[in-house]
Amino acid sequence: MKTAFPSSATAIVDLLCHRIFGIALGYEDLNDHDELRTDPGYAAIVGKSDPTGSDRSRDRDRGYALAGSSTLNRFELGSEDGSASNRYRKIVGEFSEIEELITELSLEQMALEGTPPMIFIDADATDDPLHGRQEGRFFHGYYDSYCYLPLYIFSGDYLLCAKLIPSKIDACDGVIEELKRIIPRIREKLPGVKIVFLGDSGFCREEILSWLQDEAHIDYVIDMAKNNRLLKKISAELEEAEKIYDEEGKPCRIFKGFYYMTRNSWSRYRRVIGKAEHLEKGSNPRFVLTSLVMPEYSPEMIYEELYCARGEMENRIKEQQLCLFADRTSTHWLSSNQLRVWLSGIAYILLNAMRSFALKGTEMARARCDSIRLKLFKIGALVRVSVRRVYLTMSSSYPYKTIFEMAYLNLQKIRV
């Protein structure tokens, strides 16, 4: 971010910290910052050397260490271009650099944990319902609402991409462009790692499959919509699963691997894993497409250990939207709504770093973002300000004192 015109006395880095920390602490509205700007403890966290604001140059700002909601509003409305005639767009975003920053921050965290033999890149698009007439607003038939269709890409808990997309286009549009940007960065940060792409049936497209195999040279495990030809391939297994269910009275699943090619759209035969399952409610066949081959990757392993694990990504998206307000896309402009999504993403990266490093070895090592906030961040304390320091005095009866101390010690061990 940069200031196109000197309209604010507050540095961009302060505005970034102010808003990102506010999101992490649960303050979703800019109005909340009109109260936070007078909090010396919060000002110290943001990095202000004058946490009381007594040294501000302007009389109207004196006593306020941080920016108010109007300045933050101009910050959030920042676009990719500024204009001297537009008083609300004087803070300009270098959007390509923000995208790179999100990827870089997460990859640096991954590198601190060492290079694993294999990582999974999980892509998914979700709905972001809209209740106004925002730029890029379209009706989506599947979700039965006006919405955006943000594309998220994760590797485990690590956010690599958060792209706000209008819902008038296919959910998989743009994923190749994002992967072209992300995969070289992964190979640079984690040399020698094997990369496997995971996705739902929305990503089962010839152009994506061929690009992954022929150009990116990475493997994939992708959900496939069932059809009559696929069901015929596992008809015997479905009958056997039903028979076993009738005999034993408990769910039964049988896996089968086979090679399959569509009549028109695919360029080659590809390996499909069929799951023939019978439950109380009846038959439940599923199919996934993969480039992983036997004997190292059996049908059971591919489905149960690799594909089913991608369900965790849904939890990470929930954290983005429910805990960190990535669905607060209520400004008129698509660009400023994208900026809000990125700010929520950076707040997530901050909290995930807490979870991965500070809370490692504690009972909160897998806690959700809102649980970390509630138990470790938003706690009562006495704030005292001296000439040189800001003192925080916590209650001796604070119930999570032991976890707080362990988190503090773990953070001190990190060498950046």
What are these regions (language model features)?
Residues 245, 300-339, 343, 347-355:
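Short amphipathic alpha-helical "interface-anchor" segments enriched in bulky aromatics
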Residues 219-322, 409-416:
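An anionic, glycine-rich sequence signature occurring as long contiguous blocks
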Residues 50-51, 55-151:
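Active-site-proximal, Lys/Arg-enriched surface segment
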Residues 1-17, 173:
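Basic, short loop/linker segments at the boundary and entry of helix-turn-helix/winged-helix-like folds
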Residues 350-416:
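A short, flexible helix-boundary coil/loop motif
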